[in-house]
Every structure is written in C-alpha cells, then in structure tokens.
Amino acid sequence: MTKLVVGLGNPGSKYHETRHNVGFMAIDLMAKELGLTFSEEKTFKAEVASTFLNGEKVYFVKPTTFMNLSGLAVRALLAYYNIPMEDFIVIYDDLDMEVGKLRFRQKGSAGGHNGIKSIIAETGTQEFDRIKIGIGRPQKGMTVVNHVLGKFSEDDYAMILLTLDKVETALHHYLKTNDFEDTMRRYNG
C-alpha cells in the first residue's frame, strides 16, 4: 500500500511560516523528524519526500502550485502512483477554528478553503481524510487575505508549534494503524 500525505501552503520565502502555510509546516516537521529531504518534482508541480513506514511507501508532499491550484499536484500524484482516495490525507489551515485547535475529518465541503476547493474539483470527490489546524479569524479591520498570508504572533506561534507536534504524533499513529477513525478519536481537540 502507498500513502499520500499532502500539506497545503504557498511556495517561496515570502510565505514561509505564514498562517496559510501550517500544512507545509506540518509536512516539514514530519520530514525533518524522519530525516527526509524534499526534491522538486516538476511533473507533479510539487516538492516530494518519501520513505517506507510500517512496510508502506509514504509520500510527503508540498504542492508548488500556490494554494488555489493544489488539486493539480494532488490529482497528478494520485494518478501516477495509483493511490486510492482512502490512502490520501491533507493537512491545512482553518480560520474558523481557534489558533492551535486540531480537527480530523473524513470528508466534507471545502468550507471556503481554496486549496480544498481545488482538490475537490480535480479529484471529483469530497471523500478524503483531512487534518485541519486552527489559525483563528482576522482581527477587526484586517482582511482575510492579509490574515492568512500574515505571520503568527509570538504567542500564537508557540501554540502552533505545540499543535504541529500533536499532528506529527497523530500522523505516526495513523500511518502505523491505518485507522483514521481511531486517530480522530485520539487526537481531535
């Protein structure tokens, strides 16, 4: 079996560690912990790192398409490696959740998230596993765009780092057990 774990974000140093890039941050942490390095795969429009965990090939992916076209990379990788949707998981930010809150879902709408909209449009389904990381709503007077493309405050960044550690632990559990429902029960919150 092969797994595809995708973190959403925008490429480039301008967006490094912005709220919208918590998916990239989660993937980077996982790759670092496993001693993996990313290579740019232009065919897939993504940076890809891979390893074997518990006898399964696992691809960790950061699309290089910018958020709104993330589905292009996901569709290309799923097709090339013949990975079924049940073996695909995506990690991304959610501004409707408090900063640092963690939520696992098995399916659902895009909820206004353009990266998820793109994945749904390209794969033709909402039936895929997700890990959502709360980034909170913008402060009064700030636009959503400025909020999601902005950096975390020092306090929020500290909370996000704790959440990313929890994501890493949850991903290890999921990849070991292949049981997303159990992972949801253990790590939602």
From Swiss-Prot:
Function: Hydrolyzes ribosome-free peptidyl-tRNAs (with 1 or more amino acids incorporated), which drop off the ribosome during protein synthesis, or as a result of ribosome stalling.
EC number(s) given by UniProt: 3.1.1.29
GO molecular function, one term: tRNA binding
Chief place of localization: cytoplasm
Gene Ontology cellular component list: cytoplasm
Family the entry assigns: Belongs to the PTH family.
Active-site residue list: H20 (proton acceptor)
Protein name: Peptidyl-tRNA hydrolase
PROSITE patterns, sorted: PEPT_TRNA_HYDROL_1 (PS01195), PEPT_TRNA_HYDROL_2 (PS01196)
